[in-house]
Amino acid sequence: MTIHQRTWHVLMILWAAVIMVVSVIPGADLPSLSIWEPDKVMHVFVYAVMTFLTFQWFKSFSSLDSLNKKAFISVTVCILYGFIIELIQLILPTRSFDLLDELANSIGCLLSLTGILVFSSKRK
């Protein structure tokens, strides 16, 4: 693995770890915000970043076919990661499964995918 690949890999793993830690801490320990559904906005943001980092890591490997394929794999991995975290929250006594959280996660992934595809097509 090159330094470039390793850098994206480490960033992706660290970001995924932060998401996991924040997702499993007791809900009562989370700061409360009074703005309209701010947690959903955060879900969109953190999963958009996760998708971008995952894409950058996959992009650093020339063995995968096309940028589009790398982008779609990145989105799939990140949506599944978000779903797995929601399932983990289902078994935690202080957390709960929230389908709207998973929807926000998926929207973040898809927004990132859109940005990746638009930016990639303009670079051609």
Put a short name on every predicted segment.
Residues M1-L100, S106-K124:
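Bulky hydrophobic segments
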